[in-house]
Amino acid sequence: MLGIVISAFLALGGTLGAAAAGNSVAIDAKVIDGEVYVKAASLLSQIGGTGTYNSSTKKYTYSPNSIIPDVIKKVSPSVVAIIGKPADEHSSNRFSLAHGTGVIVKSDGWIVTNAHVVKDMDKIVVVTADGKEYAGTRKQIDYTSDLALVKINATKLKIAKLASNPFKVQVGESVIAIGTPVSFSLRNTATVGVISGMNRSVTSDYNLLQTDAAINPGNSGGPLVNLKGEVVGINSMKFVDVDIDSMGFAIPADTVQYVLDHFYKYGKVKRPSLGLELEESWSAVVGLPTEEPMTVIAVSSANAGKAGVKAGDQLYSVNGKQVASAVELNELLKAHLPGQTVDVTLLSDGDLITKKLVLSESLAN
């Protein structure tokens, strides 16, 4: 018998095809008499669903119908509801409450949610999936990414798993949103949809995922999960209008992990900045594909001034990577820290030049 590894495109139609979403997976396999065999348990762990073997008929029956319920059952214990009174001294109405959703990221009571959920919330109460109530404390908050950390006094909580490779998320991939829409009595509501779009900037400083899974008030801070039960995003916002349907947005897992890493290590996001006020081209503003550079409106840091950058220069690239919008620049700078040096390529006085620029710390938050 020969032990091999196969990479199979798992598109078997219907729900299963949605589960695979075009991703390939590597599974240990063996070749017996020229036929390739894999363990059913290994296959199910990748594509979900259930399978049973009938020893009498020697038939193996696969059922994809349990994929979504299984994912919801797996993830829901890691989802919490968050409620509190708005911190408004003029609000005396006892029914004046704000609520949202959160995701457990550490078993000792650390919960990630949206900054806009808890920024003005007083006397935070967190309710876990088993109905237990805890007093919550806002620990870190980052308005730029719209993410925050809340702490409760609890142990042995089930943590959610962030997508191991968030960059493999694809348009058309099935996803599930879990949260607390509209009313606190609707905790752990699940809605199903697909990834509708990638790299959406909308009104965010970073790229967002677009989904048609129903996102309603109160879903903010809850997880958007794939059919492996991995969190691919944190639900954040939606477009609302009489002529608009099913346009929700989530903060991608890579941005969530970036912010969490900074929260844990620094207690805040140490966000780098070029120290420049930049204006996007008309094409970039309206969302057209463009290679037009951004224009320097003002120099706002001493480091940028020392580098010789001046108003009117046009920024083409940073470290050799073209940037045509503020979001593209912000995404690129996630790999850097204040104090590090980058190469900036600019058109200045008719000449295309590259300068060394020391990154400043952004004060945007």
Residue ranges, per PLM feature:
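N-terminal activation segment of mature serine protease catalytic domains
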Residues: 57-93, 101, 123, 170, ...
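Conserved active-site neighborhood of the chymotrypsin/trypsin-like protease fold
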Residues: 86-87, 106-185, 205-207, 321-327, ...
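PDZ/PDZ-like groove recognition
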Residues: 88, 214, 264-332, 340, ...
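A conserved glycine-rich beta-strand in the N-terminal activation segment of trypsin-fold
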Residues: 63-70, 86-110, 114, 132-135, ...
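C-terminal cap/linker of serine protease catalytic domains
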Residues: 67-72, 227, 231-287, 353-355, ...
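Active-site loop architecture of trypsin-fold serine endopeptidases
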Residues: 89-97, 117-124, 157-159, 178-193, ...
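Terminal peptide-recognition signature
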Residues: 77-82, 102, 109-113, 136, ...
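Primary recognition of N-terminal secretory signal peptides and signal-anchoring hydrophobic helices
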Residues: 1-65, 76-77
